[in-house]
Amino acid sequence: MRVLVACEYSGKVREAFRKLGHDAWSCDLLPADDGSEFHIQGDCVPVIMRGWDLIIMHPPCTALCVSGNRWYGRGMPKHQERIDSIEWTTGLFELAKQHAKSVAMENPVGVLPMKATQYIQPWQF
């Protein structure tokens, strides 16, 4: 299975899929922490458009999480940053759905205008 892990530079998720025999790649604006040749440093949009069986996305959560309401809520100085982040993330998710058979997005409880299909806690694994 061809797997893209977007917005990931640690390589942890990519390597877990590679160990299972999948053709897994990561992509982020930052270089890979592990220096892997299976990491694409750059904008994930053109990489998503290459077509994948599975895309897992880890968009930056700073402005997207409810825990940031104190700084990013309505009327706060960083509210526009939150709006921009929501628009970018939802656009990325819609793009991924067009170019992959399956799409997953990891993020803490947030403010995105889409309903989560499931919640998974780290202690469950």
Residue ranges and their predicted role:
Residues I56:
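N-terminal Rossmann-like NAD(P) cofactor-binding module of classical short-chain dehydrogenase/reductase
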Residues M1-C27, D33:
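S-adenosyl-L-methionine
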